Regions:
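Conserved small-residue-rich beta-alpha loop and adjacent elements
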Residues: 123-189
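N-terminal Rossmann-like NAD(P)+-binding subdomain of aldehyde/semialdehyde dehydrogenases
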Residues: 13-139
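Short, Lys/Arg-enriched N-terminal segments with co-localized hydrophobic residues
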Residues: 1-15
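NAD(P)-dependent aldehyde/semialdehyde dehydrogenase
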Residues: 284-318
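Short, solvent-exposed amphipathic alpha-helical segments in soluble enzyme
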Residues: 158-160, 188-190, 216, 240-242, ...
């Protein structure tokens, strides 16, 4: 299945373009799929570098100016960090059922990473030579969590919990604010539960620069982790070497394999869960059943009508 939009009764609706693969066409189709999301880095690198240099030279002044420009939020040194009062208010807005899910997920993630944890060890040879390794946790880590209109508690948990397990002393989370200068309650609750030491209402390349070089309000960290859009990815690439990073993550992708027994609604939900992340995201279904393909297409149209990130989904599926 490929992607595209169509008009019905004068209204644009999202559809997945369905391609039936035969032996004589599989080569060309697979080649096209590999080209579906070309490297667009060159178009953004100049702007990202400009932001980084401005924050590096002007600190908070540039940081808050870019936050207002890109996120529409007016912040100061006094309001950039999330307060305990804001976190308390967030808990009041999160349902108990969701809080239970966050805690269960957090526990599962912790158990997994505790099994990965490395330990120091030392040994002495017969001749008295000491061999070994000393494992020391980083002093500080900056966790980037996408935000704005959407909430990504999974990104919060999957980045903060491993840092806590490793023994990082200072975990600073950054996430873009809404226009009103607030962070989504679910994100705040997940951060508090996971153990973030500080939460700052900043995002984009300017947040990465602030974490890498430090400002009057944002402390410099030893490592920056977490996903983000192309600006965040390029910013992490640019500051790598001055500060450690986890990786340069590209746009979200998902490939779902399904036969005739698959539930079309579940398949559609899996595809859209990635398509809503980024305009450059790719969502692909490979199925042996034409009936399933058409049913998934119909489910996607139904889902999109009620999803708040409709515009992003439309662009990612275009």
């Amino acid at each position: 299945m490929m992607k595209g939009n169509r008009l019905i009764n004068g209204k644009e609706t999202i559809r997945m373009r369905i391609l039936q693969i035969e032996k004589n066409t599989i080569g060309n189709i697979l080649s096209d799929l590999l080209k579906r999301s070309p490297n667009h880095y060159g178009a953004y690198e100049g702007a990202v570098q400009e932001i980084i240099e401005a924050v590096r030279e002007k600190g908070d002044e540039a940081l808050f100016a870019y936050t207002e420009k890109f996120d529409g939020a007016q912040l100061t040194a006094e309001t950039v960090e999330v307060t305990e009062e804001e976190i308390k208010a967030a808990y009041e807005q999160v349902e108990e059922e969701l809080l239970a899910v966050i805690r269960k997920s957090m526990n599962n993630i912790r158990i997994y990473h505790e099994k990965q944890k490395q330990y120091s060890w030392f040994d002495t040879t017969e001749k008295g030579t000491m061999l070994g390794q000393k494992v020391t946790a980083l002093g500080s880590v900056g966790v980037y969590v996408p935000g704005g209109k959407a909430a990504y508690p999974s990104s919060v948990l999957m980045n903060i919990v491993p840092a806590k397990v490793a023994g990082v002393k200072n975990i600073c989370m950054v996430t873009p604010p809404g226009k009103d200068g607030t962070v989504t309650p679910t994100t705040l609750v997940a951060a508090k539960e996971a153990g973030a030491d500080h939460i700052y209402k900043i995002g984009g390349a300017q947040a990465v620069a602030a974490l890498a070089y430090g400002t009057a309000s944002i402390p410099k960290v030893d490592k920056i982790v977490g996903p983000g859009n192309i600006y965040v990815a390029l910013a992490k690439k640019a500051v790598y070497g001055h500060v450690s990073i986890d990786s340069i993550a590209g746009p979200s992708e998902v490939l779902v394999l399904a036969d005739e027994t698959a539930n079309p609604r579940y398949v559609a939900a899996d595809l859209l869960s990635q398509a809503e992340h980024d305009e450059l995201a790719s969502a692909i279904l490979v199925t042996t059943s034409m009936e399933v393909a058409k049913a998934v297409e119909k489910e996607i149209e139904g889902f999109v009508k009620v999803l708040s990130r409709k515009e992003i989904i439309q662009k990612s599926l275009d």
